[in-house]
Amino acid sequence: MKTLQDYIDKLNALNFKDMYENDFFLTWDKTDDELEAIWVLADALRFMREHNISTKIFESGLGISIFRDNSTRTRFSFASACNLLGLQVQDLDEKKSQIAHGETVRETANMISFMADVIGIRDDMYIGKGHTYQKEVVDSVTQGYKDGILEQKPTLVNLQCDIDHPTQCMAYAAHIIHEMGGLENLKGKKIAMTWAYSPSYGKPLSVPQGVIGLMTRLGMDVVLSHPEGYEVMPDVVDVAKKNAEKSGGSFRITHDMADAFKDADVVYPKSWAPFAAMEKRTNLYAAGDQAGIDALEQELLAQNAQHKDWCCTEELMKTTKDGKAMYLHCLPADINGVSCEDGEVEASVFDRYRDSLYKEASYKPYVIAAMIMLAKCQDPAQTLKALEERGILRKMK
């Protein structure tokens, strides 16, 4: 049976000092030790909550959330993570702010950050915009701190941008690590990141990009599968190739869903929009070309409709490793006969993995909390020990 000291010992064996007072943009910005520290600390925080030990490292402070796209799981995961550490969450509704009246990013970032310790941002809809916006926010609060406007520089956590979805993908990895009995057991395991049909269009590229950008770090055999014309960002493909070479894993692209599923230990069938089309959409929005946007939407819907056979079926699942591959999804999935007529996954497959999917999602609040804590505590291992010795109950019995 594990004790808190087991997690503390693991943390003490890792080098993650550069995460202190730093931000989290992309998983491939971080070292292997830094990624492992997040998983270890996430497990430690979960252990403490399950044992009714308060993990509040803040007596006051704000966690600011900015969501430029719809969210349920990530929104509540960020709020849960902040609450777990003692921060109060304040969501910035840009429609109700002065941004519509010409307030600059620098001004907004500083005005919301006087007592903020963390800012979580989701900005995933437009290629070339989300990651850039997050960087601009960080540059703004960094300068505000240097100029003495802010008492502290809030840490940024990327809650999804146009390039990566790190909190989601780190939660996937945490789930896989637990299911496979340890990080070292992921080496050589096959994961299929495959496109799947959806009756909608424009789903973000950051999920498949985040998966191939992270899982190739872990020595896994990563297969990216999609119909021709559904390519992801070339820069992220290059990252995946380099990661695989360094980790001893592998990375390849196929246009055959069955090839990807064959003998896979983990499958992740999900729809996404073609990179080239999303670049075009960004340019059309920038030009205010509504007719062009409408035409592109119809073009993409017609393109999707040609690939309705790209679906996670019982037949395909039988071809995976022992017919029992792990099935991942960020949710909500497009389920045949439930949320749509034709979609990403057959209802019987989804129903069989429902509990596993919910369990997978439960790792995200702890992953986000770990990211925040590593950025705000100079010695997280010592902080864990102090929290244990303090002995404050999370909930009175």
Language-model segments: residues:
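Adenosine-phosphate binding glycine-rich loop
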Residues: 320-397
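Short, conserved loop/helix-junction motifs that constitute active-site signature segments
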Residues: 185-187, 216, 315-324, 352
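Phosphate/diphosphate ligand-binding glycine-rich loop within oxidoreductases
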Residues: 56-177, 335
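Positively charged, low-complexity intrinsically disordered leader regions
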Residues: 1-76, 80
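Glycine-rich phosphate/diphosphate-binding loop of Rossmann-like nucleotide-binding domains
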Residues: 68-80, 177-291
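Rossmann-like adenosine-cofactor binding region
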Residues: 242-346
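A short helix->loop->beta-strand "cap" motif at the edges of active sites that frequently abuts
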Residues: 147-154, 220, 319-328
